[in-house]
């Protein structure tokens, strides 16, 4: 009985400990960048105006997507047949379409090279997320789901839950706010 009780306590303490995350300085720097980048946009995906400048924006969402996609910008190795590049793991077929919509003629190599810069990867991630926010009339859960799985919202449901959970973790633990002394 005593062994079972100790094993149970150990399991509970391990579960509690596993919910805490330790980030490297590089991960924190990248997620703070994503947070600051996202904060210039309101939660409907539009640029903030003087009326809503002090309301929270897409900062935690952008940082959480970065965490989900590349572990905060440190896991950038491409996987076979994955076709996603940059810190936000921008999907190459989608990038081809978005670049073409803007009237640019870029090769895959040029797109991949462009996405190696975090500001470009963040910008294109925002463009994709704001597209889906517009399609889903501001429903952040559906937009995140579609960010991952396109029109098949149900297929991206688990992804959206994971991103929102990460965003809440980052927000609740105040890991991204810049402290002024």
Curated annotation (Swiss-Prot):
Which SUPFAM superfamilies does this chain map to?
A: Lysozyme-like (SSF53955)
InterPro entries from the xrefs?
Lysozyme-like_dom_sf, Transglycosylase_SLT_dom_1
Source organism superkingdom: Viruses
Encoded by which gene? y06E
Q: What is this protein called?
A: Uncharacterized 20.7 kDa protein in vs-regB intergenic region
């Amino acid at each position: 009985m005593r062994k079972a009780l100790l094993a149970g306590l150990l399991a509970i303490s391990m579960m509690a400990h596993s919910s805490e995350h330790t980030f490297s300085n590089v991960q924190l720097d990248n997620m703070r960048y994503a947070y600051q980048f996202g904060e210039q946009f309101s939660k409907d995906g539009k640029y903030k105006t003087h009326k809503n400048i002090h309301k929270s924006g897409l900062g935690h969402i952008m940082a959480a997507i970065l965490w989900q996609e590349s572990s905060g910008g440190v896991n950038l190795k491409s996987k076979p047949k994955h076709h996603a590049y940059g810190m936000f793991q921008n999907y190459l077929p989608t990038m081809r379409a978005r670049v073409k919509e803007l009237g640019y003629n870029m090769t895959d190599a040029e797109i991949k090279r462009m996405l190696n810069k975090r500001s470009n990867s963040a910008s294109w991630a925002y463009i994709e997320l704001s597209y889906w926010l517009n399609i889903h009339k501001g429903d952040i859960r559906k937009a995140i789901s579609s960010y991952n799985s396109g029109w098949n919202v149900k297929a991206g449901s688990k992804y959206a839950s994971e991103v929102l959970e990460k965003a809440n973790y980052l927000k609740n633990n105040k890991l991204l706010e810049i402290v002024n002394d």
